């Protein structure tokens, strides 16, 4: 049995969140699983996620394939209908330990996606670093209050909410203490 693998697609925020997902899945004892943290910013991003899911299903037929992220939040039915997918978890739910612990319980739900617009808090998690990366990313904000006609972000991430400044500073200090250097900000 092996620890869960996390395949991260999309933005830097997904990279940050993938570390929390990895910790939650490992703490829950999830084994032989591949978790796809997807992007929905373009139709191509969603297509590539579906393609990656099918490829991994062929390569690891016994693995549980779990889909989360913006594409899963925006269109959970599309992923639930894929025979290869074992479970679909929404963007808010992926950040909590409980869904990962209950995921494959005999009476557990296979689709855990709720109303992202009702979420008011941010991640509230500290990470030690980002696996396989020399640069770390931190969350300072999530979501968007604008509803531009061309943009799907609010529907995947919810309304705008900020991480309290003290938590941002504590996260930066932890990462610096773990060997990461302060770089320029990308917004």
Predicted regions and their residues:
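Proteins enriched for Cys/Gly/acidic motifs involved in redox and nucleic-acid/cofactor modification
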Residues: 1-184
């Amino acid at each position: 049995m092996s620890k869960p693998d996390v395949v991260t697609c999309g933005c830097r925020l997904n990279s940050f969140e993938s570390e929390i997902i990895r910790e939650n899945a490992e703490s829950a004892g999830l084994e032989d699983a591949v978790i796809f943290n997807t992007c929905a910013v373009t139709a191509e991003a969603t297509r590539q996620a579906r393609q990656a899911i099918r490829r991994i299903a062929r390569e690891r037929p016994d693995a549980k394939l779990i889909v989360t992220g913006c594409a899963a939040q925006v269109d959970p039915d599309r992923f639930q209908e894929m025979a290869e997918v074992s479970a679909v978890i929404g963007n808010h739910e992926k950040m909590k330990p409980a869904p990962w612990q209950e995921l494959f319980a005999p009476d557990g739900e296979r689709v855990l996606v709720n109303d992202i617009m009702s979420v008011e808090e941010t991640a509230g998690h500290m990470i030690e670093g980002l696996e396989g990366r020399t640069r770390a990313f931190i969350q300072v904000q999530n979501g968007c209050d604008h509803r531009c006609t061309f943009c799907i972000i609010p529907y995947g991430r919810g309304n705008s909410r900020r991480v309290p400044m003290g938590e941002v500073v504590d996260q930066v200090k932890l990462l610096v203490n773990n060997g990461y250097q302060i770089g320029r900000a990308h917004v």
